[in-house]
Each structure stands twice: as C-alpha cells, then as structure tokens.
C-alpha cells in the first residue's frame, strides 16, 4: 500500500469506536469529522463528558519512529510550558495501532481563531514561538526530514512531468514556469542556517486563542530554519508585514535569538510551499476526498492561474527581501 493510492475507505465508524474502546474509552457522542485531508480526525465526547480528538494517520506517510518523534516533541513542549495539543498516553504509549492504522488521542482544545491582524495576539504568539524554538534547539529530529529543495521542489517537478491532471495544451507553459521558479529559488536558497525542530506548518489556522495561543497539529514538524515558523503568520502589504514581523521578532527574542539573515528565506520558502502543496494535491488524487473537495484541479482556468502564480513568484524572488527598520 502506498499513501498516494490509500483512500481510508476501510476506516468505518465501528472501526474507530473499537479502536477507542480497546483503550478504555467509551464514546458517548457521535464522531464529528474535523477538517483534515492528510489524515482522518474526529472529535468526540466520552462517558465522563470529556472531549477528545482522535487522529488516524495516513499509512506510509510517516513511519512509527517519525510519528513518535512528533509526539515526543509535543510532550517536551508541554513540559516546558508551551501551549500545544499533545497526545494522551495509554499504558505509557502515545502511538496506538488498530487493524493496521496508527492513531493517537488528543485532548480537545477549544478556542477562537487566532487573529493574525491583532498585534497583541501576534506578540503573544511570537513569545511562545521563541519558547517553542528554545525547546526545539535542544536536539534535532533524527527520523523526520529537514526542509530542503529536493523534497519541496525537485521531487514535485518529477511528478508534474508525468502528471495527467495537467491539461496537455497547458503543460509545456506550466513546466516552463515551474523550472523558472525552481531556478529562482535555487539562486536565493541558503543552507548555512541554524537547524532546529519546528512546528513546520505554523499558520493562523493552526493556532487557537484561549486567553493566549494554543498551537495544534504538529503533523508537519521537521527540522529547518526558525523563519519557517514565522513567515506564514504575515499578511497584508509589505509595510504591514514588516510591522508584524518586527512584533514577532521582538517578542521571540525574549526567549530565543533570531538570525535576521533568515528573512531572505521568506520568499524562497513561499515558493517551495506553492510547489509542494500542488504536488501534495496531485499525489492524493486517488483518494475520493480530494476530487470531491478540490474539483477545480481538473479545470484549465486553474492551471492558467497556477502558471501565472509561479511566474509572479519567480519575479518576486528577484526583488530585495523584506527589510526591517534599522533598529534590527
């Protein structure tokens, strides 16, 4: 079984209930699916009216060792008083197995959506990211990957070459735009940055607000530069992004040193995310959930827009990076 073709069709509600029951959890409510395409995630309430989330991992995306590293990082963060949703241990085990599925149970953490344009909230997030990275620097992931050009650009480019989803009449222009974007990223990429363990997918949708931030979903945790956990929080025009980044860095540096040279990686990382995300969609197209939720991927208009986006991002990479005020 490879994770590209896997569809979760055998993960029935009874299978989920049985898996939880074997861990001593009796579900007293329905299973409410949460928004996750990579894995299958459900919220529920047990007989004691405690609320939990159960995550069933997509087979073969991560190995058991890689998932356990994610769990270990989350538990270390909780121990260091960083607000993250960490897995619950059953008989000392956080990674569980049922009928060939790896799964984990988490406490359900409610909260409002993080307001990316709220400077007070941004400052608090920056402070906790500094603490998160303080923990992240204590050791590196051994089994989980490090952010790099091969995973984010080279492998997706090979996938695009053979893809049948790309309309034949638009494929040459799309591949040309992809190659130009890869060349632009490669020219501006650095590998002399300090590597640490990261959240990996730290955008506003993965932060809840309950009198402070709560970080969720460490599924994309990996090694990489600190800026990876900062840049996706920025929004608006360059002036707004500058103010937001300065707010984050000032709070961040209460706990961790930040290398401002990494700001030059923001646009390369943005380009890498654009390419990687598209490849992710295409790899999972055999899963019925993807054609259902992303039907536009088969339309010519989408590929025209995607080609234009790649061309524009290649141009952005030729511009000077975001500049902080002189005090930085």
From Swiss-Prot:
Record's subcellular location: Cytoplasm
GO molecular function per UniProt: ATP binding; magnesium ion binding; protein serine kinase activity; protein serine/threonine kinase activity
Record-annotated active site: 201 (proton acceptor), 217
Enzyme's top EC category: transferase
Annotated GO CC locations: cytoplasm
EC numbers on record: 2.7.11.1
Feature type site, description ATP: 36
Upregulating conditions: Expression is regulated by the CpxRA two-component regulatory system.
Alphabetical list of InterPro entries matching this protein: Aminoglycoside_PTrfase, Kinase-like_dom_sf, SrkA/RdoA
Domain of life of the source: Bacteria
Positions annotated to bind Mg(2+): 206, 217
Cofactors (names): Mg(2+)
Catalysed conversion reaction: L-seryl-[protein] + ATP = O-phospho-L-seryl-[protein] + ADP + H(+); L-threonyl-[protein] + ATP = O-phospho-L-threonyl-[protein] + ADP + H(+)
Main location: cytoplasm
Keywords annotated in UniProt: ATP-binding, Cytoplasm, Kinase, Magnesium, Metal-binding, Nucleotide-binding, Phosphoprotein, Serine/threonine-protein kinase, Stress response, Transferase
Role, per record: A protein kinase that phosphorylates Ser and Thr residues. Probably acts to suppress the effects of stress linked to accumulation of reactive oxygen species. Probably involved in the extracytoplasmic stress response. Also has a role in LPS synthesis, through regulation of the galETK expression. A protein kinase that phosphorylates Ser and Thr residues. Probably acts to suppress the effects of stress linked to accumulation of reactive oxygen species. Probably involved in the extracytoplasmic stress response.
Family statement: Belongs to the SrkA/RdoA protein kinase family.
Assembly and oligomerization: Monomer.
The protein's name: Stress response kinase A
